[in-house]
């Protein structure tokens, strides 16, 4: 059916109200077709000391995405920003992202997350692909890719994720039945957080944690709390010079290191268990780590390092889009009903072969793309340019840090007509691959891309064919930058059984 449902809210505010603003991207059309030097790129200026005070006061920079969005409004589709002695160039057009992708080397580089690197160095631990550049990154990445991104790997882990998604559905049904009103209103974020940890841990280590019930064991609860703590403290440490934060943020550093220590110990125990199973004749079930151990192409230190990063990286990147998708579907009941009809029509085929969810649910896949357009988990993608490039008629030299703003791209009316409206159908009608960059691109795309897609598709498929999702909240959810883009508070959602 034709989907014309639209949110009653203007998601691009407050910038649409600014009298000085213009449509994003107009500067490129007005610029003469002549090469300009790097120094001619419009510069965004802020007092460095005031910026530091703001970060200290906020314990991070919750409005970073909005600040950069406003800068695009003022300066056009490309600008540069000084971060100390480092110049960062910000861009936000799909054609620029495509040009950067085409110029990528076989081992693209980006700046490394300093607080995480500091923990590994202080503890004498190896680093995985998320914290590596150069030949070592490429060596690790080429050996992990087949077990995370290949069709063969997806075929292996889809039934595992489906099992967890079905268990979550049963958990939700019990909660609803236990309620005298025959419905359930809840803050869904913690449930989604636990679901993604449960599913990812099962795929990585072949072991269930038991996070879908009400009574978590103390070890699992500490594990969940430690992952939450890492996500909370990381942005407080990454936006200021490390020398300064080590002097004024010792409590935050300690919390971050203690949390990493606990997660590292937890992951190490699981990797060792898998190793012992492989050595004694083979694991009981397929898992990513069992494949890496059996293959023997990576050292145990490298397997431990990558297991740690895959565990930490599998949480908010999936749970936030799930919450925001359910929220938008609750605000757009016509879209929700169309998705439900699609899931009910595909129920038999997906039940027989869960992998069919990837092909038989095109509208649901479009819904996820639309959610990630409005609420990209990563505010921007980063590259350190390996060669000189001409971007928007400006010369940008090799070695420059480039940030591609996904938040502003998703709100650009020149790229997405009526960007303030929630219109999943737009993704059924377009082919631009560089308009959907949530999981990155090229050889450095998100390693957990396929797993995240499967986790989201199957969970939403099972929940939406069984429940109507409603909300009384009509206003926009305030999104804040906390290492990933997340809601400042999770919207209250109500689940009612489908009659």
Swiss-Prot record:
Interval spanned by the transit peptide: 1-24
Membrane topology, record value: Peripheral membrane protein
Known pathway: Steroid biosynthesis; glucocorticoid biosynthesis; Steroid hormone biosynthesis
GO molecular function, one term: steroid 11-beta-monooxygenase activity
Pfam families: p450
Listed InterPro entries: CYP11_CYP27_families, Cyt_P450, Cyt_P450_CS, Cyt_P450_mitochondrial, Cyt_P450_sf
Record's keyword terms, sorted: Heme, Iron, Membrane, Metal-binding, Mitochondrion, Mitochondrion inner membrane, Monooxygenase, Oxidoreductase, Steroidogenesis, Transit peptide
Cofactors, names only: heme
GO BP terms in the entry: aldosterone biosynthetic process; cellular response to peptide hormone stimulus; cholesterol metabolic process; cortisol metabolic process; glucocorticoid biosynthetic process
Record EC number: 1.14.15.4
Binding site for heme: 446
Localization per Swiss-Prot or TrEMBL: Mitochondrion inner membrane
Family affiliation: Belongs to the cytochrome P450 family.
Name the record gives this protein: Cytochrome P450 11B1, mitochondrial
Organism from which the protein derives: Mesocricetus auratus
